[in-house]
Swiss-Prot record:
It catalyses: ATP + H2O = ADP + phosphate + H(+). Residues 600-609 have a biased composition (Polar residues). The gene is RH17. This is DEAD-box ATP-dependent RNA helicase 17. Residues 566-609 are annotated as: Disordered. It holds the Pfam family CTE_SPB4. Residues 61-255 form the Helicase ATP-binding domain. Keywords: ATP-binding, Helicase, Hydrolase, Nucleotide-binding, RNA-binding. It comes from the Eukaryota.
Length: 609
């Protein structure tokens, strides 16, 4: 009987493994077959729920275990974090003599943002549950340096860090022990460089020294001559990433996307792999090769669509799409990307207060009926560190929520069960598109990505197509037709334009009424309008010919922030306030001078008498 039950379980497990392998994301092998310690493999399965490795993990883990430098280039959501953390823990848990925190730092993981720093740290903590003597830690901007120095003084075995704060400690924290350093990992390397940390990374590499442990002091537990291992992980490939690879990696193996452009610049190497379906992903990097092609991969299960929306109807279209998403499937999470922090703040306040129908209340006295019946969060770089941490952590645990964010959330963050990504503002570079859409359709799950485009921006689709992204049009008019028309507005049989749709007109009026009913909301709208126009004018390179600020109708831009005034009136109002403030300051200054003059005259007359 027991044998029959065990056989049934094994058959069920084999069927599950085969199903995952067929999905094209998971390998038909186990973590233990990759060479990982049994306890660590059990930890991955029992505590973290990973029954089988992804193809990227199946290919990367054995190569990293072998000690080779590695460049991992794979789509977001393919398990790259586990791919490098698991081999580190495997080596450290079996190290002789046993690793102690007094030995200092053995591994450095460098990440672009604070949120990703915390995310990697949380994953590391779970993996180390059975290996309590290996101490994880992090240092990042926004934290108190004194507390970080105290933690470094005690010792951190695996340290996750943002570039700026790491460089600070390398230069100024004498108690930061890293003489036993064996691994340096650059996670989301493309994002690190896009955020302008290139010079910091160069300094960090110089301060950490050459590829070998040359000190050989008596208390070193890493023998002299042991080669330091560097790993570089990136969702996209470009010239900057290639330059960093040449600077930091020694004769590396590349694991990642199999594309023709890439193979023209790289020579193929096929080391022994645990799974034949993963062998094609290994590439040997030739340091003398031409720069890597700027390319990226997008999960095949991701549905990509665009919305062609006139500027004046953008706000209504966004709210309508969000409402439709949550009415279609209540238990889901959505991330909306904006180009500026002011835009995030305005839309966050708007969604937190906007009622529909206007001034509606539920049966419970004083309870507002909000337009979106879900929690709203925001995330951007100007928020206090504790607020950022709270928003990031709470949104991850919510089942039904929307997150409004700048690109700070596009950098490798893993939000469970995000079903849709909305790019309300186009990314500054076409390559940034992949980071944003990578927040959904992770580890084989389905996802949807929506991109808002004005009619004058439609050529942006051609730019995306150059990089392998193909989008179909979203049926916005059909979605708008689903909503009931409030009041006595007649339903038109055939709506000629988006702006003339009864739902759009009624919703726009209600939004403008809210903005003008509250001075704070109006101020947020003005700030968002100004920063959005400035950001639009800042597009560079090939995108400058697509996003032309002179082609914008600024009155329609104002409308997209629920402002009734023409931009000239908004600007004039702001100009008047500025002139009035300067005039008041001049008057105060003149009054002060008069008082001093009168005081001085009185003193002189007293002296004369």
């Amino acid at each position: 009987m027991k044998r029959a039950q065990q056989s049934a379980r094994e058959t069920k497990q084999e069927a599950k493994d085969a199903s995952k392998a067929k999905s094209g994301l998971f390998a038909s092998c186990s973590f233990s077959s990759l060479g990982l310690d049994t306890k660590l493999s059990d930890q991955l399965k029992e505590r973290m729920g990973f029954e089988a490795p992804t193809l990227v993990q199946a290919q990367a883990i054995p190569v990293i275990l072998s000690g080779r430098d590695v460049l991992v280039n794979a789509p977001t959501g393919t398990g790259k974090t586990i791919a490098y953390l698991a081999p580190l823990i495997h080596h450290l848990q079996g190290h002789s003599p046993k690793v102690d925190r007094s030995h200092g730092t053995f591994a450095l993981v460098i990440v672009p943002t604070r949120e990703l720093c915390l995310q990697v740290y949380e994953t590391l903590e779970k993996l180390l549950h059975r290996f309590h003597w290996i101490v994880p830690g992090y240092v990042m901007g926004g934290e108190k340096k004194a507390k970080e120095k105290a933690r470094l003084r005690k010792g951190i075995s695996i340290l996750i860090a943002t570039p700026g704060r790491l460089l600070d400690h390398l230069k100024n924290t004498a108690s930061f022990v890293h003489k036993n350093l064996r691994w340096v990992i650059f996670d989301e390397a493309d994002s690190i460089l896009e955020l302008g940390y290139g010079k910091e990374i160069e300094q960090i590499i110089k301060l950490l020294g050459s590829g070998q442990n040359e000190q050989g002091e008596e208390d070193d537990i890493v023998p002299k001559g042991i080669q330091k291992q560097n790993l570089l992980l990136s969702a996209t490939l470009n010239d900057k990433v290639n330059d960093l690879a040449k600077l930091s990696l020694d004769d590396p193996v590349m694991i990642g996307l199999d594309n023709t452009k890439l193979q023209q610049n790289l020579s193929i190497e096929s080391p022994a792999a645990p799974d034949s379906d993963a062998e094609d992903m290994v590439i040997h990097v030739n340091k003398s090769a031409n720069p890597l092609s700027e390319d990226y991969g997008i999960p095949s299960q991701l549905v990509q669509r665009y919305l062609r929306v006139p500027c004046g109807a953008r706000l209504v279209a966004l709210l309508s799409v969000l409402k439709n998403l949550f009415e279609r499937e209540a238990s889901q999470k959505v991330v909306v990307f904006f180009s500026t922090r002011d835009a995030v703040d305005f839309h966050y306040s708007l969604l937190s207060e906007f009622q529909w129908p206007p001034n509606s209340e539920t049966e419970e006295e004083g309870t507002k009926e909000l337009f979106l019946k879900c929690k709203t969060f925001r995330l951007h770089g100007s928020m206090e560190q504790e607020d950022r941490r709270s928003a990031f952590g709470t949104f991850k645990t919510e089942k039904q929520a929307v997150l409004l964010s700048t690109d700070v959330a596009a950098r490798g963050l893993d939000f469970p069960k995000v079903r849709c990504i909305i790019q309300y503002d186009c990314p500054g570079e076409a390559t940034e598109y992949v980071h944003r859409v990578g927040r959904t359709a992770r580890i084989g799950e389905k996802g949807e990505a929506l991109l808002f485009l004005q009619p004058i921006e439609i050529d942006y689709l051609k730019e995306l197509k150059k990089h392998g992204a193909s989008l179909t049009e979203y049926p916005l008019m059909k979605v708008l037709d689903k909503f009931p028309i409030p009041g006595n507005m007649p339903r038109i049989k055939k709506v000629l334009s988006l702006e003339s749709h009864p739902w759009v007109i009624s919703l726009q009026r209600a939004l403008e009424s809210l903005t003008y009913a509250e001075p704070k909301m109006k101020s947020l709208a003005k700030n968002a309008f100004v920063s959005w126009v400035r950001g639009y004018a800042a597009h560079k390179g090939e995108l400058k010919s697509i996003f032309v600020v002179k082609k914008l109708h600024l009155g329609h831009v104002a409308k997209s922030f629920a402002l009734r005034e023409q931009p000239s009136l908004v600007g004039k109002s702001h100009h008047k306030e500025t002139m009035k403030r300067k005039r008041d300051e001049r008057q105060k200054g003149q009054q002060g001078k008069k008082r001093k003059k009168m005081s001085g005259t009185g003193n002189r007359s007293t002296q004369k008498t």
